[in-house]
């Protein structure tokens, strides 16, 4: 049996993540150390920070050599570029034409056990874009679906035998002024009275190696 608050506090100390959260209800709890920002909207400015491309830390390699290997990895680069293109396209549907820009491209973020490729994409919302338009355009996040999004979703619905539940969904808030922030629910535990559920996945492209992904 898990004490949600205690577990979340210990998890936050050992694996701090920018989009971590805890939901505690009498029937269930969600404990998450998600690192990924899907939507951050302030006024007419909107951004997304897709994460795609991962390297597990290796005690045999120092940090500099590990990063050199990471940056030369064609598969991880292709995966990240694909997701960046898709998220840029999603933003373009709701933003002023020409305003969507990649502000930071393929920077490396370091976590306790991993390195990730992260990009920052920003745009200026068009005047007609409403909250529902933003949600429809950006959700579900591209990094947990793949490209092209709609056909991939249809394929996943046929192939996946069980519903993902909260996994790869989003958690966040919408303010009264329309500002919002949402993450992508990964690295999370869905905890019930007597059971706990953890979902995992990997991004697969043509250059993927099954053993490496596992």
Language-model segment annotations:
Residues 1-214:
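Extended alpha-helical targeting/anchoring segments
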């Amino acid at each position: 049996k898990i004490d949600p608050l205690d577990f979340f506090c210990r998890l936050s100390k050992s694996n701090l993540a920018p989009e971590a959260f805890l939901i505690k209800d009498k029937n269930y709890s969600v404990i998450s150390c998600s690192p990924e920002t899907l939507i951050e909207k302030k006024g007419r400015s909107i951004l997304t920070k897709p994460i795609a491309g991962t390297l597990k830390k290796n005690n045999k390699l120092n940090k500099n050599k590990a990063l050199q290997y990471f940056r030369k990895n064609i598969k991880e680069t292709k995966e990240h570029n694909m997701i960046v293109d898709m998220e840029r396209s999603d933003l373009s549907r709701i933003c002023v034409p020409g305003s969507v820009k990649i502000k930071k491209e393929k920077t490396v973020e370091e976590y306790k056990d991993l390195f990730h490729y992260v990009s920052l994409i920003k745009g200026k919302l068009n005047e007609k874009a409403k909250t529902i338009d933003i949600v429809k355009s950006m959700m579900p996040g591209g990094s947990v679906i793949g490209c092209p999004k709609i056909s991939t979703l249809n394929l996943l619905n046929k192939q996946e035998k069980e519903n993902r539940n909260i996994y790869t969904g989003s958690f966040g808030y919408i303010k009264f002024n329309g500002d919002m922030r949402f993450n992508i629910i990964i690295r999370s535990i869905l905890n019930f009275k007597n059971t706990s559920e953890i979902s995992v996945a990997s991004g697969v492209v043509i250059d993927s190696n099954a053993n490496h992904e596992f």
